[in-house]
């Protein structure tokens, strides 16, 4: 069994001149885009633990994919330090980025993001391409601005 590299145990220094930092910043920033999450789910389903048979009820714990486990561990590692103020200050969309990283900690969510309904809820757009009522209400109410907790609540109901 290969030992993890020592440099991944510690987050990179938070400086834009550090190549590893900028690479990870670009990756976590891209996770704020629900359509990028959909792209990952469709093109790399094994990384997210999505069954190749397409049966969403199929969960095979006996033969868990080592790539999916490694990717889940990498996401946990990223979330552990990007949520801190030292790092989150560099995010252009910290709310959406940290929400995506938090949701990606859940195995069920990683499997469910292949479903268009989940992606559309994250994007705040219904399947007809119109802005959802919840999203419209958030934009019209200043106190709710930036609060997207309804995605997490609705996630389990899809």
Curated annotation (Swiss-Prot):
Recorded superkingdom: Eukaryota
UniProt keyword list: Activator, Nucleus, Transcription, Transcription regulation
Stretches the record annotates as Disordered: 130-158
GO molecular function, one term: transcription coregulator activity
Annotated Gene Ontology cellular component terms: core mediator complex; mediator complex
Keyword Transcription recorded: yes
Principal place of residence: nucleus
Alphabetical GO biological process terms: regulation of transcription by RNA polymerase II
Localization (cell): Nucleus
PANTHER family from the UniProt entry: MEDIATOR OF RNA POLYMERASE II TRANSCRIPTION SUBUNIT 31
Function recorded in the entry: Component of the Mediator complex, a coactivator involved in the regulated transcription of nearly all RNA polymerase II-dependent genes. Mediator functions as a bridge to convey information from gene-specific regulatory proteins to the basal RNA polymerase II transcription machinery. Mediator is recruited to promoters by direct interactions with regulatory proteins and serves as a scaffold for the assembly of a functional preinitiation complex with RNA polymerase II and the general transcription factors.
Family that this chain belongs to: Belongs to the Mediator complex subunit 31 family.
Subunit description: Component of the Mediator complex.
Protein name: Mediator of RNA polymerase II transcription subunit 31
Organism listed in the record: Emericella nidulans (strain FGSC A4 / ATCC 38163 / CBS 112.46 / NRRL 194 / M139)
Gene name of the encoded protein: soh1
């Amino acid at each position: 069994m290969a030992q993890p590299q020592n440099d991944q145990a510690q987050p990179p220094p938070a400086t834009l001149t550090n190549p590893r930092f900028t690479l990870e910043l670009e990756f976590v920033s891209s996770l704020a885009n629900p359509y990028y999450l959909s792209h990952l789910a469709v093109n790399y389903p094994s990384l997210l633990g999505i069954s190749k048979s397409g049966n969403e009820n199929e969960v095979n714990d006996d033969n868990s994919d080592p790539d999916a486990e490694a990717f889940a561990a990498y996401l946990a590692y990223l979330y552990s330090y990007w949520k801190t103020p030292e790092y989150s200050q560099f995010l252009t969309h910290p709310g959406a980025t940290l929400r995506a990283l938090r949701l990606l900690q859940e195995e069920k969510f990683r499997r469910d993001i292949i479903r268009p309904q989940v992606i559309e809820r994250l994007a705040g757009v219904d399947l007809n391409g119109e802005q959802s009522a919840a999203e419209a209400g958030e934009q019209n109410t200043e106190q709710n601005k930036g609060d997207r907790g309804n995605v997490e609540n609705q996630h389990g109901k899809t």
